[in-house]
Amino acid sequence: MKITPIPINKIRNPSFAIFSTIKSIVSKESFDIVHAFNIPSAFAMKYCNAKKKVLSVHGMYSEQVSALHSDTTANIAQITESKVLKWADKLTTDSLMVKQQYKEKLGIDFDFIYAPLDIEKFKDLPNVPKKEKQIVYIGRNSYEKGIDLLKEIENEIDANVVYCTNLQWKEAMIKLKESNVLVVPSRMESIPQIIKEAFYLKIPIIATNVGGIPELITHEKTGMLIPPNNSKKLKETILKEL
């Protein structure tokens, strides 16, 4: 289902939920399986004509909303979340941490399935030379991603910091490939796909030890883990890696 949400911060997800739900209600198509990603998509999933419905989540949705929105919005999300999850025949997540959170807080069971990495796509990437002292951030320009922490210390680092917040996948991978370090300064996460992509391209990683990130990175073996919300430690670790 192709839906274009309103591209405005804090309106994007609600607009997607509304538009996709309307499309599902009026659609006459039927399916064997409908697979929805994250809570905003579940409303469309509910009204789809399908034999089985699968909902995958990447992080505990109510906690994500709580970090970004008002208490009222967070309370609504928490109440809605527990109801929405019951609409699916099967629930999946790509993080053991998220699976545990939902079990402990809502008593809901999820199947754990790692998100795959399509390595065939990497064959189309061109060979690019490394750029000296280049650091790259790839992700949304959003508070929970911690991009502000990197911007806070950018002028204190003798390096070129590249922010890829709205690039197509291939363009972002070229930037990653030519960089010396990938920085993932998130305040909350599930399992960032960008870490797997950096592994494949053999790019060193500095990431916060939040969410499912420690499920991928072993400190000082497969990457560097730092505490969240700590721009000082982020700067120290970047300087050490450079």
Residue ranges and their predicted role:
Residues 219-220, 224-231, 239-242:
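Conserved acidic donor-binding segment of nucleotide-sugar-dependent glycosyltransferases
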Residues 204-207:
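Short hydrophobic beta-strand element within catalytic cores of glycosyltransferases
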Residues 187:
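Aromatic "clamp/platform" in nucleotide-sugar-dependent glycosyltransferases that forms part
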Residues 73-91:
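Membrane-proximal helix-turn-helix segments that form the acceptor-binding/catalytic region
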Residues 33-35, 48-65, 92:
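Active-site proximal beta-strand in glycosyltransferases
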Residues 36-41:
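Short His-centered aromatic/hydrophobic patch
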Residues 92, 129-145, 151-154:
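Conserved donor-binding/catalytic core segment of Leloir-type glycosyltransferases
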Residues 97, 116:
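Carbohydrate-associated surface elements
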